[in-house]
């Protein structure tokens, strides 16, 4: 009821509904002044009771013919103590859009009827749970709510009222149904605001993604170069050159920009080469220049050790490289000592034949 009173406020303060006052006032006045256009709650409730097959006095056609005189004194006294329903002024409907559903006196009186039925539960026969659910609102009343703008079409209730309406008022009722069931215009539609916006504003997905990082570097460098050119053109006062640079800045990248992209890619690859590897590569699979040089140095050492093994005896029996080198050093020193001894012996040697020739 609070929401209904808020909707039918005779003095609307919001400026959003003032734009709907452009509808003809005669049409709205005809809908307000016509008492037969409103919903009859007694007939509507009796139709739902009979359609659901409720047994007893409530489901019989005599339910409509019962007069308030046949009710008990307790129910009459309780109905007398109830506050009267609020009277709606015709001017309260002027601030509403033409497609918004109207509420008549019959629906406002349905509250008193529901309370009336709730008091007399001990005088009537027990009813099913469907009657309790439908006493508050019909089953399919909120099935045709529009998901785009939030306005309900209320087509089921309009169909019930159109079946019960007399031929004399059929024209006005059809106009009312057509206005209420018409899809809302573009002025009445509410803009949808997404609650969760997709997080797609990041320039790249991850810091370690090389492709996105290269694209980001190239775009930043291209923008910096273009901004520098624009600044130089503004200082020199060349208006035509500035316009051309501006069009180039807004257009697709040209050959110069692609060359700068290639330069940025080369710099990025060199940066990757200078950064040490986090994971150790297998032997023979490393591509770093230092790794390649180390591998070449080790291959040279192994080749020289093989040559030493061929020259130095008993060197192949050693398993340790340091022991092999010590053995080779000792062998070389021994050879040097032998060489020195032989030289000394040759110097001190005197041949007898030479002495005879000299005499």
Swiss-Prot record:
GO biological process: cellular response to nitrogen levels; photoperiodism, flowering; regulation of DNA-templated transcription; regulation of gene expression; regulation of nitrogen utilization; regulation of photoperiodism, flowering
A Pfam family that the UniProt record links to this protein: HLH
Residues with PTM Phosphoserine: 60
The keyword DNA-binding belongs to this UniProt entry's keyword annotation: yes
Subcellular location: Nucleus
KW Transcription regulation (keyword) present: yes
One example GO MF annotation: cis-regulatory region sequence-specific DNA binding
GO cellular component: cytoplasm; nucleus
Protein name, UniProt field: Transcription factor bHLH130
Gene that encodes it: BHLH130
């Amino acid at each position: 009821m609070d929401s209904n009173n808020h909707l039918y406020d005779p003095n609307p303060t919001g400026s959003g509904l003032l734009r709907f006052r452009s509808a003809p006032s005669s049409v709205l006045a005809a809908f307000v002044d016509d008492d037969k256009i409103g919903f009859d709650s007694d007939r509507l409730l009796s139709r739902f009771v009979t359609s659901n097959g409720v047994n007893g006095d409530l489901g019989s056609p005599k339910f409509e013919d019962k007069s308030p005189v046949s009710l008990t004194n307790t129910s009459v006294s309780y109905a007398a103590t109830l506050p009267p329903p609020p009277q709606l002024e015709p001017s309260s409907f002027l601030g509403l859009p033409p497609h918004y559903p109207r509420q008549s006196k019959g629906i406002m009186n349905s509250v008193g009827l529901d309370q009336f039925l709730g008091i007399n539960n001990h005088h009537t026969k027990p009813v099913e749970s469907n009657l309790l659910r439908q006493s508050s609102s019909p089953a399919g009343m909120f099935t045709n709510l529009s998901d785009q703008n939030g306005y309900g079409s209320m087509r089921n209730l309009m169909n019930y009222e159109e079946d019960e309406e007399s031929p004399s008022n059929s024209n006005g009722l059809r106009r009312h149904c057509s206005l209420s069931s018409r899809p809302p215009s573009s002025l009445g539609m509410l803009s949808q605001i997404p609650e969760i916006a997709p997080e797609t504003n990041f320039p790249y997905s991850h810091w370690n993604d090389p492709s996105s990082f290269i694209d980001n570097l190239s775009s930043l460098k291209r923008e910096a170069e273009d901004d520098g050119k624009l600044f130089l053109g503004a200082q020199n006062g060349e208006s035509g050159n500035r316009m051309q640079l501006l069009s180039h800045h807004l257009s697709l990248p040209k050959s110069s920009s692609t060359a700068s992209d290639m330069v940025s890619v080369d710099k990025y690859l060199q940066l990757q080469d200078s950064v040490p590897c986090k994971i150790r590569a297998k032997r023979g699979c490393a591509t770093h220049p230092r790794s390649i040089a180390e591998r070449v140095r080790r291959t040279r050492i192994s080749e020289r050790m093989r040559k030493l093994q061929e020259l130095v005896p008993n060197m192949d029996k050693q398993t340790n490289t340091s022991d092999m080198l010590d053995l080779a050093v000792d062998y070389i020193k021994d050879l040097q000592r032998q060489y020195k001894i032989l030289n000394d012996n040759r110097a001190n040697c005197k041949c007898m034949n030479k002495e005879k020739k000299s005499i």
